[in-house]
């Protein structure tokens, strides 16, 4: 499987704070056709606020999903595979080792997105799917919330906030009252 070839099928693996997702697409238009879409809840961000590390259990769940996704992409004759990782892999003390494990398994370099890039990726998804969108795009993940302005097929200011579903759960220790305060 090669990176960057145009045309044909391609896959994207998103390694997030709560889930790992594979989406396979068929190229051919501004909005590529989705052929396959699967998400595995790995919980990489679980406990990250307190420990500063990705747990061994969550890493194993994520790596098992990635191994499976690689086989699926190869079986579907995907011509390229792109792997991105977000805030959990970016901020964890053992994030670089985890990324190295992914690269060893797949042979594909992992792009660790910063907060602005996460916001841009969400905006590109909207730009590909809607005619002349105008407004604010929000992407709520397990470890962060990204907001970005879009209009006239252009990206505006984008920000990433440390408020995701897993982070809120961890920081509030499961208390609804504490979560509301945060």
Predicted regions, residues:
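Nucleotide/phosphate-binding catalytic cleft detector across ATP-hydrolyzing
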Residues: 1-17, 23-137, 148-182
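Active-site-adjacent helix-turn-beta-strand microarchitecture at beta-sheet edges
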Residues: 142-144
């Amino acid at each position: 499987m090669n990176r960057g070839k145009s045309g044909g099928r391609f896959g994207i693996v998103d390694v997030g704070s709560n889930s790992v997702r594979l989406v396979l697409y068929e190229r051919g238009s501004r909005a590529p056709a989705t052929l396959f879409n699967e998400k595995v809840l790995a919980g990489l961000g679980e406990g990250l606020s307190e420990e500063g590390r990705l747990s061994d259990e969550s890493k194993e769940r994520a790596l098992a999903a990635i191994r499976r996704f690689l086989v699926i992409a190869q079986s579907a004759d995907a011509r390229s595979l792109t792997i991105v990782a977000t805030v959990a892999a970016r901020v964890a003390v053992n994030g670089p080792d985890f990324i190295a494990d992914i690269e060893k398994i797949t042979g594909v370099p992992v792009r660790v997105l910063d907060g602005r890039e996460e916001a841009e990726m969400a905006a590109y998804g909207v730009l590909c799917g809607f005619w002349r969108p105008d407004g604010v795009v929000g992407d709520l993940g397990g470890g962060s919330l990204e907001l970005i302005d879009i209009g006239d097929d252009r990206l505006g200011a984008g920000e990433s906030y440390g408020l995701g579903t897993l982070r809120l759960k961890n920081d509030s220790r499961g208390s609804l009252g504490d979560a509301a305060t945060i």
